[in-house]
């Protein structure tokens, strides 16, 4: 995967992380994505109308600043976006704050603001292995005419000690 990580032919990826009342896990999930070994990606966190401190924690941890964004309405069922934020310290991090509408609506909002041809969706309690995106994108590079989607393997770490991670 090392050659793939340095290749100019690797597709850029938009990682979409939807979060509704995820104050306990969202920071760790964001850190996990940001530590990926991948040449070019953006992370779009969609705060789906959380009533806890999810958005406030993100704003504090990643120095979010309100940003005007142009929203393509390529997917109509994306709900009402209240605001978008960019990190002052992490250029590939964008946060969308929207009214609660459920996971599919949150992901649609993320797709509408994404910049890249491939996207990956994850939950706010997920952690990635360092090469997860490289492994996921590889089939697209090997057979772009036939591959339209890939999936990952989910492993439960409840009660386990994570040595490398957020």
What are these model-predicted stretches?
Residues 29, 74-113, 135:
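Glycine-rich, basic loop-to-helix element that forms the pyrophosphate-binding segment
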